[in-house]
Each structure stands twice: as structure tokens, then as C-alpha cells.
Regions:
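ABC family nucleotide-binding domain
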Residues: 6-216
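ABC-family P-loop ATPase nucleotide-binding domain
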Residues: 1-14, 222-228
Length: 228
């Protein structure tokens, strides 16, 4: 797929840790509302690619552009603001704040941006309802199952109306049934809101929920047409 009309584009990324190359000429693009699975074995460079795309780490060479602007041309403060306003994140273990209730966790991005608590929690509950966890609002993360916690994390990622969600092995800690339901809900919610998803996984069953696959091997990315 060509970068024309893409929201996020990476070109010829190289990144090494010491003498060990993690990315060796990787290129990537994702369109608005598209779900792209990044597949590859452990150590292939797929998580490094995701972190470069999100502006968390800076590649040694190559460019990452979001909405036509290169991330490297932004200041650290601008990249941080971009991650708060336009990017959402879901990780393998959710990374919810244990001291907060589930609804407070989901509302947190809005609260940090200055939204009043009542309004933030009202919006949070709407997303929790879409992710089928609105009945868990008063519970804390330690009181819910792994699958429920991941749904809460997805609601938190979507609550601030991001343009891109970066999901790094979001079902890796779940059993098959819970993993499939989490992916169904993530896909439905993202597509309904026209949110792009960059999904890092090593599981073909998880990648089956994507529109397109990108395989990373030895630090190089190769686009594949999705044939589900």
C-alpha cells in the first residue's frame, strides 16, 4: 500500500542498541481507521518499530511523519503533547493505576487535559459501556479479571478521541477466548470512531482482526495484503 492518504508514515528506519541492530531499513504506513497488524518473532524489531512510530524513541536514521509532519522536527514537549492528544496506548498488562477505580483510570487522560471530573467520568462510562465493562466502574484493577482489565485499558486509550492507537501484544496475557473478545471489541470501537490501530503481535489469530499485515524480520518490514 502506498503512503498516499496515510496518517502515519515511516521511511527507511534504522535503530541499533549498541552494536545490535533492531531496525534495518523498516518502512510502514497506516491510513485513518485502518487496523494494521505488525507480526514477527521475538527480537525481530516489531516493538522497536511501534515505539519509533509513537515517538517514544528516536530512530538513528529514517523519518516518521504524522499528519504530514516529521516527529523529529517536533520538540520533546510537542511530541509529549501529541501522545496525549492524538495517540492512545494499550499494553500487554494494561498498566492501569492500581490505586484508582476503573472509571477513574479511564477518565484519567481527560482529567490530565483539564476536563472536569464529572464530565470526564461521564465520558469514561460511555466508553466502558461500549467495551462491556461499565459495571466495573467502582472496582479497582486488582478486583477484575485480566480480560476485563484489558477492556478497561482499551476504553482508556479511546476516551480522549485519539487518531491512532498503539497496541503492543494486547492479548498476550489472556487466554484464547478472552483474547478474541478483546480483539473484537477493540476492532469494533476503533472502526466506529475511525481510529487507526497499530497492533503488535506474534499470534496469527490476533492478526486476523486486522485489515492488513506487516511482517517484521531482522529489522525489516514487509507489507502483506490481508486475506482473512
Amino acid at each position: 500500500m502506498t503512503p498516499a492518504g496515510s496518517l502515519l508514515v515511516a521511511r527507511d528506519l534504522h535503530k541499533s542498541y549498541g552494536s545490535t541492530p533492531a531496525l534495518d531499513g523498516a518502512s510502514f504506513s497506516v491510513h485513518p481507521g485502518e487496523i494494521v497488524a505488525v507480526l514477527g518473532p521475538s527480537g525481530s524489531g516489531k516493538s522497536t518499530l511501534l515505539h519509533c512510530l509513537a515517538g517514544i524513541i528516536t530512530p538513528d536514521s529514517g523519518t516518521v511523519s504524522y499528519a504530514g509532519r516529521e516527529l523529529s522536527a517536533m520538540s520533546d514537549a510537542e511530541r509529549s503533547a501529541l501522545r496525549r492528544s492524538d495517540f492512545g496506548f494499550v499494553f500487554q498488562f494494561g498498566q492501569l493505576v492500581p490505586e484508582l477505580t476503573c472509571v477513574e483510570n479511564v477518565a484519567l487522560p481527560l482529567r490530565l487535559s483539564g476536563t472536569r471530573r464529572k464530565d470526564a467520568e461521564r465520558t469514561a462510562l460511555r466508553w466502558m459501556e461500549r467495551l462491556e465493562v461499565d459495571d466495573l466502574g467502582a472496582k479497582r484493577p486488582g478486583e477484575v479479571s485480566g480480560g476485563q482489565g484489558q477492556r478497561v485499558a482499551i476504553a482508556r486509550a479511546l476516551v480522549s478521541s485519539p487518531k491512532v492507537i498503539f497496541a503492543d501484544e494486547p492479548t498476550g496475557a489472556l487466554d484464547s477466548l478472552n483474547g478474541e473478545r478483546v480483539m473484537q471489541l477493540l476492532g469494533e470501537a476503533a472502526r466506529s470512531a475511525n481510529v487507526a490501530v497499530v497492533l503488535v503481535t506474534h499470534e496469527a489469530r490476533v492478526a486476523a482482526y486486522s485489515d492488513r499485515d506487516v511482517t517484521v524480520r531482522d529489522g525489516r518490514a514487509r507489507d502483506l495484503e490481508h486475506t482473512a
